Regions:
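Ubiquitin-like/PB1-type beta-grasp interaction modules and other compact soluble beta-rich domains
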Residues: 1-87
Length: 88
């Protein structure tokens, strides 16, 4: 048995103002198995603390379906963080 921890790789997408704050629209991230969307977002907040101010108004999606922040991640998932939409 290997002592090296396994990881999962997910694709992360940012939209709207979040692209600027996060430093890009798309990124691949390696996480520990069992990680949840909220933990993924926390990784980005650790790098870009300004993202924390958007957390309460964001919606997350997993594989193009709305998802709760407590949703577990799986290898190959595509996670998108979407700011509120406004329009006229």
């Amino acid at each position: 048995m290997s002592s090296i921890a396994q990881s999962i790789r997910v694709k992360v997408l940012f939209f709207g103002r979040l692209k600027e704050v996060a430093g890009g629209a798309e990124e691949f991230v390696e996480l520990a198995p069992g990680s949840r969307i909220e933990e993924l977002f926390a990784c980005f907040v650790a790098r870009q603390p300004e993202l924390a101010r958007y957390r309460r108004s964001l919606v997350a999606s997993r594989n193009q379906e709305f998802a709760a922040w407590s949703t577990p991640l799986h290898p190959g998932d595509e996670i998108a963080f979407l700011p509120p939409v406004s329009g006229g």
